[in-house]
């Protein structure tokens, strides 16, 4: 399974429809043992760090614990979540695993 979180959905839509081939480059820090752990990592580690990178003033950025509050902030960057189980019809997906931490 691949989890992808986006603010406007434009990157998610391209993961589902459009190109015939999609490549994912995945660092070792992005691999989780199960879906629950992956969602927790994405929402409570990656999203707050990415929101901070964009200088957003969301609860996950301004709070001391830097975790997701499932907020309604207009600056929220995690409005859409995609869980890709298998490639969509007519699309090829290739995953490239890199043995180092990449991104958040």
PLM feature segments, named:
Residues 2-104:
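Conserved phosphate- and dinucleotide-binding cores of soluble alpha/beta proteins
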């Amino acid at each position: 399974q691949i989890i992808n979180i986006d603010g406007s959905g434009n990157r998610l839509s391209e993961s589902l429809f459009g190109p015939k081939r999609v490549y994912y480059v995945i660092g070792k820090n992005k691999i989780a043992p199960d879906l629950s752990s992956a969602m927790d990592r994405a929402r409570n580690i990656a999203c707050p760090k990415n929101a901070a990178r964009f200088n957003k003033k969301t609860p996950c950025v301004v709070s001391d614990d830097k975790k997701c509050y499932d907020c309604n902030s207009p600056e929220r960057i995690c409005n859409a979540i995609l869980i890709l189980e298998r490639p969509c019809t007519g699309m090829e997906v290739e995953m490239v695993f890199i043995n180092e931490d990449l991104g958040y």
